[in-house]
Amino acid sequence: MSLSLGDIKFPDNWDLIPNEKNYIDYVYKESIELEVWRPNNKRDLMAHNNVVSLAKYFWPHVDFNRLVMGGELMVWFFSFDDVLDAGIYTDEKQMDLVKRMDNVFINGTVESDATGPEKMALHLRKKCEVMCGKRRKDTFNRFISSCVQWVDSIIPFNKLRSAQGTSPHLELYSYLRKVNIGAYPCVTLTEVMLDHEIEYYIWSDPKWIKMNEDIAIITTLINDLVSYEKEVNDQAGDLNPLYFLQNQKNIPLPDSYKQVVDLIDFWVKDYQTMEQSLLNEMEFKDSKQRSDMEFILEHLRYLASGSKKWSMQTPRYCSPTSPFIEMRTKPSTPVMNSTKKQKIDHVPSQSFISTPIDLNN
């Protein structure tokens, strides 16, 4: 049976060329120093290279320092989430870890026995606080709030399985997963990276909020598709819609896949409608403000299209037996990150941000 991710269609202006990959080693050294990863551990190194490479797809138009921040966010995401997903801690211990991580972001402090993910979180928080300064305190607060929101979503989402006993309805799953997927911290980190002059009211505009939700759901569904084989093999398919739709509706895999693709197409169209409506209502005071907004919108869309591109090359999900032809690899052949860049017609409105980060201020 062969399915194709080519059935997922995005508008041309969602296409991207991944950023450079030289930041990956830099973030790895940081992660060793912060005790996220173990020195000279091949498994940790492989995990690092897989997950941190996602940043170059999410932020293709930022400079090295900001790309490093994206890599740090990925390290924090995966290392903290994996701890809670592993099933090695009691409910009480998991709640304690969540409370400790919330404290890192809210108060900017860590315990004396801080874990690696907690140290990485504090490290990134300090960078964001410096970059935002006093003038953009609201931006910093949005980033902090989105990170706390994500941390607080992990246990409730994991409880979907045990609380229900069976797979959840797709609507309930999507509602919780759009927070749990981690898209919002990526969006707010993009705002941190950009020294923008966008009007404050935009961030509370219902259209902007709905656009964020649309992209989060699209990204969720893409992640669920590409992780299908891995999750089924790990006995975790009951929280994957590609799997549980087969069981709930008694349909074969191709039909389940078509339903998910149709959902993605629906949310892409909804996003486009919302984006156009938002832009039609906005009155830009100058070209800088217009360029800032275009940059934010580009990188919001890249969360969806970047997820798809990254998934088709990462060893985290690619395998010889993948149901998706684009993700099949030869047995025992590692999938390497491609450095060959594709030609695209869309030229980003703002190719690079290159303002230095001064951590001494």
Swiss-Prot record:
GO terms for biological process: sesquiterpene biosynthetic process. Induction: Expression is detectable but at low levels in vegetatively growing cells and increases during development induced by starvation. Expression is highest during he ultimate stage of mature fruiting body (approximately 24 hours after induction). It catalyses: (2E,6E)-farnesyl diphosphate = (2S,3R,6S,9S)-(-)-protoillud-7-ene + diphosphate. The keyword Ubl conjugation does not apply. Keywords: Lyase, Metal-binding. One of its GO terms (molecular function) is metal ion binding. It is an enzyme of class 4 (lyase). The keyword Signal does not apply. A motif (DDxx(x)D/E motif) lies at residues 81-86. A motif (NDxxSxxxD/E motif) lies at residues 223-231. Its EC number is 4.2.3.160. Terpene synthase that converts its substrate farnesyl diphosphate (FPP) into the sesquiterpene (2S,3R,6S,9S)-(-)-protoillud-7-ene. Belongs to the terpene synthase family. Contains several highly conserved motifs that are important for catalytic activity including the aspartate-rich 'DDxx(x)D/E' motif and the 'NDxxSxxxD/E' motif, both of which are involved in complexing metal ions to coordinate the binding of the isoprenyl diphosphate substrate in the active site. This is Terpene synthase 6.
